[in-house]
């Protein structure tokens, strides 16, 4: 099983990164947005991975923090929660935030995640309580750290953010609305990562 990949980041298109190891092999890895936002093109990265096998594909999911991978693995053990939903959950909030919301039994916080309704949120709160209690996550900063990778064209940045949100289950209109709200105060974004962070924060105020 592939558990950790270290190498140079060759390609970034949210939520996928391609990392080439010293052996010359490039691995396509799907990451939750907080982890994706910490990668920088052409720089070295070490990514904890989960190898996921389906009938039609073999996929790698990656995480900067090993504990985040531990949370992902607990999520996909729950009936009805596939890898895509688990990735969406860890994109909408950090592992620390998810654990906090579960401990506080915050149903509203979970229903903000695409694809999770009230009944699903209630079930997740019950099942995750025991699954996450023994996982120690970093609570020192509940907002993920951003190390921006410079991208020049604003239209390209917006298109990439919109595509990333839609791939995680948000509707096109929802993605566009959140991006518009993030830019409403006149702030400009020089990189994809900072706009992603600002846009994700907007979803917290929509519900």
UniProtKB/Swiss-Prot annotation:
Domain III: region residues: 153-207
Localization of this protein: Cytoplasm
Gene3D superfamilies, sorted: 5' to 3' exonuclease, C-terminal subdomain (1.10.150.20), DNA helicase RuvA subunit, C-terminal domain (1.10.8.10), Nucleic acid-binding proteins (2.40.50.140)
Renumbered residue ranges of the record's region Flexible linker: 144-152
Region entry Domain II, spans: 65-143
Region (Domain I): 1-64
GO molecular function terms listed in the Swiss-Prot or TrEMBL record: ATP binding; four-way junction DNA binding; four-way junction helicase activity
InterPro entries, alphabetized: DNA_helicase_Holl-junc_RuvA_I (IPR013849), Hlx-hairpin-Hlx_DNA-bd_motif (IPR003583), NA-bd_OB-fold (IPR012340), RuvA (IPR000085), RuvA_2-like (IPR010994), RuvA_C (IPR011114), RuvA_C_sf (IPR036267)
GO cellular component terms listed in the entry, alphabetical order: cytoplasm; Holliday junction helicase complex; Holliday junction resolvase complex
Main subcellular localisation: cytoplasm
Top-rank taxon: Bacteria
Pfam family, one: RuvA_N
GO BP annotations, alphabetical order: DNA recombination; DNA repair
Quaternary context: Homotetramer. Forms an RuvA(8)-RuvB(12)-Holliday junction (HJ) complex. HJ DNA is sandwiched between 2 RuvA tetramers; dsDNA enters through RuvA and exits via RuvB. An RuvB hexamer assembles on each DNA strand where it exits the tetramer. Each RuvB hexamer is contacted by two RuvA subunits (via domain III) on 2 adjacent RuvB subunits; this complex drives branch migration. In the full resolvosome a probable DNA-RuvA(4)-RuvB(12)-RuvC(2) complex forms which resolves the HJ.
Primary role: The RuvA-RuvB-RuvC complex processes Holliday junction (HJ) DNA during genetic recombination and DNA repair, while the RuvA-RuvB complex plays an important role in the rescue of blocked DNA replication forks via replication fork reversal (RFR). RuvA specifically binds to HJ cruciform DNA, conferring on it an open structure. The RuvB hexamer acts as an ATP-dependent pump, pulling dsDNA into and through the RuvAB complex. HJ branch migration allows RuvC to scan DNA until it finds its consensus sequence, where it cleaves and resolves the cruciform DNA.
Family of the protein in this entry: Belongs to the RuvA family.
Record comment regarding domains: Has three domains with a flexible linker between the domains II and III and assumes an 'L' shape. Domain III is highly mobile and contacts RuvB.
Entry-linked NCBIfam families: ruvA
Protein name: Holliday junction branch migration complex subunit RuvA
Organism expressing this protein natively: Psychrobacter arcticus (strain DSM 17307 / VKM B-2377 / 273-4)
Lineage: Bacteria, Pseudomonadati, Pseudomonadota, Gammaproteobacteria, Moraxellales
Gene: ruvA
